[in-house]
Curated annotation (Swiss-Prot):
Residues 214-607 are annotated as: Polymerase. The gene is 44. The keyword DNA-binding applies. The keyword tRNA processing does not apply. GO terms for molecular function: 3'-5' exonuclease activity; DNA binding; DNA-directed DNA polymerase activity. Disulfide bonds: none annotated. Keywords: DNA replication, DNA-binding, DNA-directed DNA polymerase, Exonuclease, Hydrolase, Nuclease, Nucleotidyltransferase, Transferase, Viral DNA replication. It catalyses: DNA(n) + a 2'-deoxyribonucleoside 5'-triphosphate = DNA(n+1) + diphosphate. InterPro entries: 3'-5'_exonuclease_dom, DNA-dir_DNA_pol_A_CS, DNA-dir_DNA_pol_A_palm_dom, DNA/RNA_pol_sf, DNA_polymerase_A, RNaseH-like_sf, RNaseH_sf. This is DNA polymerase. GO terms for biological process: DNA-templated DNA replication; double-strand break repair; viral DNA genome replication. Belongs to the DNA polymerase type-A family. PROSITE patterns: DNA_POLYMERASE_A. Its EC number is 2.7.7.7, 3.1.11.-.
Length: 607
């Protein structure tokens, strides 16, 4: 057996590494002695859990002063059995970002997450309940390295968590590759692994008492949300490989055509090199007046919009550059990535982070559902319902505005939703007069204001987004405040609370820090956070009703599902019913839609 020593916070920590089967007796004694609670972690070949060559190399168990490392790569079946038995007898398991490690154990050892989630205490969840702000935005951050720096020591964070970067440099490889290539028994690799559980145990002890009393009921709630999302991650979304490959090839061909034209006619070698593009526009006579902080000519979305508005050859060039850039981004960031990361069963896997933003809003990687073009079906067409299934989408009706009505108690807005009135038209008429109709542009301005107020936007934001004058924008904003005085009062109340305390508390008991210099953001944080909880509570109801195996994506105010074709209409209606919520006097209703085989069919695709 290998024994390593490391000092942390004045304590000498022992890292025990099993080398031979006979060393396992000591490991079993350790598990029996600490079966009430242990920190657990895994070391793997990378982050792509569902790729064909992914494997788990080490599994670690630890307390605040001692850890045991099992080299699974060497122990093979014996090691897997030991891990299974150890996890089975533990009453409580502490992990950092549990969803990842539980999916590793499920994928590599067949230890079902369903059996482990009830035992889990996730330090990342605790950290986000203590302070949801990322490092650099006033918070201490939520990665293990950031938490070590905050609660143990910056030196430990740099020296121990920096070991893998150091090893990558020494072995002349990348940090992404070192995980799979470093010798299994390299002492620094083993130190890194063994100390992870020690750090996690210590961080848990430091964080637990810091969770605000008002937020303590959220601990089991957030663990349940994380659990449900991990099952959605594990299930994956079926990829139409043939269609996706054809689309990737088509876009590559079109991209190469545009790039050839831009090179031959305008001398642009790289469309993503702004200096190349700027040079071409200067040759067409454009004089740059806007520059970046580093002094380079500013070429951004606003610049391209101005060039297109100017017309002529500059507009033609701007459109070609944008098309070439778009094709490159859509192909490499989306379609080719789907093809490259699909598993052996042609499924792509999401990685849902249910507590991402400071408001706890969800984020999704793997399948970037939140960033796909809103009305375009082309990329969504890559994904299919399971055989014999069709796609369904169930989304909330104006979720954030209805939450705003419920929380603010504004009588006019509440009544408007009860009556099914046109809220945007009401705002427009309050600003411009009763002669405004739903077809007038003023309604569009009012719509921007209605949603803008949720996000803390004022007249300047409205003017920027709609192109109207600042005077007209102020008129619409004043119209909103006149139409819904309860919202104005509620916004002022939250701003005062934020100024007084440095935070507000949402209806679920979540503490939301608000910068005292930006107290106008309090309303936005409250609405966004509460809306997120509406969706999350719906996920729990759907899970309890047995729908989780059919869910593919939770996207803010929408759930995407794969449903058996013969029961799809019933299933979509039932999901919609379970998602709907009565928030005080306001019904946050839902709209179910059933499509064809592909996700894109919900956006206009014919399959």
């Amino acid at each position: 057996m290998i024994e390593l020593r490391h000092e942390v916070q004045g304590d000498l920590v022992t890292i025990n590494v099993v080398e031979h089967p006979e060393d396992l007796d000591g490991f079993r004694d350790f598990i029996r002695a600490h079966q009430n609670c242990l920190a657990v972690d895994t070391e793997t070949t990378g982050l792509d859990i569902y790729s064909a060559d992914f494997r788990c190399r080490l599994v670690q168990f630890g307390t605040q002063t001692e850890s045991w490392v099992l080299p699974i790569e060497d122990l093979e079946m014996l090691g897997r059995e030991e891990v299974h038995e150890a996890l089975d007898v533990l009453n409580k398991i502490v992990m950092q970002n549990a969803s990842y490690d539980l999916q590793v154990l499920d994928r590599c050892f067949g230890i079902k997450m369903e059996s482990l989630w009830p035992k889990i205490l996730d330090t990342q969840i605790l950290a986000k309940l203590v302070d949801p702000r990322p490092f650099g935005a006033g918070g201490f951050g939520h990665s293990l390295e950031e938490l070590i720096a905050e609660f143990i020591s910056k030196e430990q964070a740099e020296n121990v968590k920096g070991l893998m970067a150091k090893l990558a440099k020494e072995h002349k490889t990348t940090k992404a590759k070192i995980w799979s290539t470093i010798d299994l028994y390299h002492p620094e690799y083993l130190t890194y692994a063994g100390m992870d559980t020690v750090f996690t145990a210590r961080i848990c002890s430091a964080l637990a008492p810091l969770v605000p009393d008002v937020s303590r009921p959220l601990v089991p709630y957030e663990h349940k949300i994380s659990e449900i999302c991990s099952y959605i991650d594990r299930r994956g979304f079926l990829l139409d490989v043939e269609y996706s490959q054809q689309l990737a090839d088509k876009w590559l061909g079109e991209q190469q055509v545009w790039e050839a034209v831009l090179l031959n006619e305008y001398g642009i070698e790289k469309v993503n090199a702004t200096e190349d593009v700027a040079e071409a526009f200067e040759e067409l006579g454009h004089k740059f007046t806007a520059f970046t902080d580093s002094g380079k000519r500013k070429v951004d979305k606003g610049f391209y919009a101005d060039m297109i508005a100017a017309g002529g050859e500059k507009a033609h060039l701007a459109e070609m550059v944008q098309e070439a850039k778009k094709l490159g981004k859509w192909r490499t960031s989306w379609v080719q990535t789907f093809l490259d990361t699909r598993d052996s069963e042609d499924r792509c896997h999401t990685f849902v982070n249910p507590l991402q933003a400071r408001t706890s809003r969800m984020s999704i990687t793997g399948i970037p559902a939140q960033t796909l073009p809103a009305s375009d079906w082309t990329v969504r067409r890559c994904f299919l319902a399971d055989p014999g299934h069709v796609m369904a989408s169930i989304d909330y009706q104006a979720q954030e505005l209805r939450v705003l009505a419920a929380l603010s108690g504004d009588r006019t807005m509440i009544q408007a939703f009860k009556d099914g009135a046109d809220l945007h038209l009401m705002t427009a008429r309050a600003a411009f007069g009763d002669h405004i109709t739903k077809d007038d542009p003023e309604r569009k301005y009012a719509k921007t204001v209605n949603f803008g107020r949720v996000y803390g936007g004022g007249a300047n934001t409205v003017a920027e987004q709609t192109g109207i004058s600042i005077e007209t924008a102020k008129q619409v904003v004043d119209g909103f405040d006149k139409a819904y005085p309860g919202v104005t009062r509620y916004s002022r109340k939250l701003a005062n609370e934020a100024k007084r305390n440095g935070y507000i508390i949402n209806p679920m008991g979540r503490r939301l820090p608000v910068d005292r210099s930006r107290t106008y953001s309090a309303l936005n944080y409250q609405i966004q956070s509460t809306s997120r909880d509406v969706t999350c509570k719906a996920l729990i109801r759907l899970h309890e009703a047995g729908f989780t195996p059919y869910l593919r994506l939770p996207i803010h105010d929408e759930i995407v599902a794969s449903l058996p074709a013969e029961k799809a209409n019933w299933g979509a209606r039932e999901i919609a019913r379970l998602m709907a919520e009565e928030m005080g006097p306001v019904l946050i209703g839902t709209d179910p839609e059933v499509g064809k085989r592909s996700w894109g069919s919900l956006y206009g695709a014919d399959y």
